[in-house]
């Protein structure tokens, strides 16, 4: 093991990277409420892991979606646990995100020079809510169907572009297979990718600027 480590150390300077990560200064005013962002990240990672596991069994079609979810819950080994953890961590992620936003706002963490960190955080909040909207529809039960119908119908009130925008969201004039396909793609590919990118930007800026001081 020593030789393997030395081989990587010679090329990547692993020890220098580890020292930089572990030696970052933490202000004395930092308390448990400053961990809310990290808890949100942890929930996101749990979401990725459990969501990936369910993609092996979930079928994104209007005729098979509900049955595939029932199959996960009743037939797949620990499928009920995986889906339950996915749902619980989703709720926890939203809650932790809201508390994190309040903490940052109340402690002035959005002020100069951390404006861009705040902007990326707001974008991450929008992405988190979008996860909830798209994921809610995937079981394609009565609640999911009507939730999608209502949410995608909201833009119709916008003058001129309302109707075309609704059709883009649904994939057709009415809610159906195209809508489910769009929401599944958003939930499992587009939103996770965007979230990972903006989280990386968010953390790099925090790393560069450090934790904001007390008010």
UniProtKB/Swiss-Prot annotation:
Heme b 2 binds at residues 86, 187. It is a multi-pass membrane protein. Heme b 1 binds at residues 100, 202. It comes from the Eukaryota. Heme c binds at residue 35. Its cofactor is heme b; heme c. GO terms for biological process: photosynthesis; respiratory electron transport chain. One of its GO terms (cellular component) is chloroplast thylakoid membrane. The chain crosses the membrane at residues 32-52, 90-110, 116-136, 186-206. Pfam families: Cytochrome_B. Gene3D superfamilies: Cytochrome Bc1 Complex, Chain C (1.20.810.10). PROSITE patterns: CYTB_NTER (PS51002). Belongs to the cytochrome b family. PetB subfamily. The 4 large subunits of the cytochrome b6-f complex are cytochrome b6, subunit IV (17 kDa polypeptide, PetD), cytochrome f and the Rieske protein, while the 4 small subunits are PetG, PetL, PetM and PetN. The complex functions as a dimer. Heme 1 (or BH or b566) is high-potential and absorbs at about 566 nm, and heme 2 (or BL or b562) is low-potential and absorbs at about 562 nm. HAMAP family: Cytb6_f_cytb6. Component of the cytochrome b6-f complex, which mediates electron transfer between photosystem II (PSII) and photosystem I (PSI), cyclic electron flow around PSI, and state transitions. NCBIfam families: PRK03735.1. This is Cytochrome b6. The gene is petB.
């Amino acid at each position: 093991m020593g030789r393997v480590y030395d081989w990587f150390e010679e090329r990547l300077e692993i020890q220098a990277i580890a020292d930089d990560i572990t030696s970052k200064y933490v202000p004395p005013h930092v308390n448990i409420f400053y961990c809310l962002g990290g808890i949100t990240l942890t929930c996101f990672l749990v979401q990725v892991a459990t969501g990936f596991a369910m993609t092996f069994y979930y079928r994104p079609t209007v005729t098979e979606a509900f049955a595939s979810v029932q199959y996960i819950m009743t037939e797949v080994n620990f499928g009920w646990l995986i889906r339950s953890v996915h749902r619980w961590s989703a709720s926890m992620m939203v809650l932790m995100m809201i508390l994190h936003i309040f903490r940052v706002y109340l402690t002035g963490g959005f002020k100069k020079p951390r404006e861009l960190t705040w902007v990326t955080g707001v974008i991450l909040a929008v992405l988190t809510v979008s996860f909830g909207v798209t994921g809610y529809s995937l079981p394609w039960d009565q609640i999911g169907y009507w939730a999608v119908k209502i949410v995608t119908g909201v833009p119709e009130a916008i003058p001129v572009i309302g109707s075309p925008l609704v059709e883009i969201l649904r994939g057709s004039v009415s809610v159906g297979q195209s809508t489910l396909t769009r929401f599944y793609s958003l939930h499992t590919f587009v939103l996770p990718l965007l979230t990972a990118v903006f989280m990386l930007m968010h953390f790099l800026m925090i790393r560069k600027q450090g934790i904001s001081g007390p008010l």
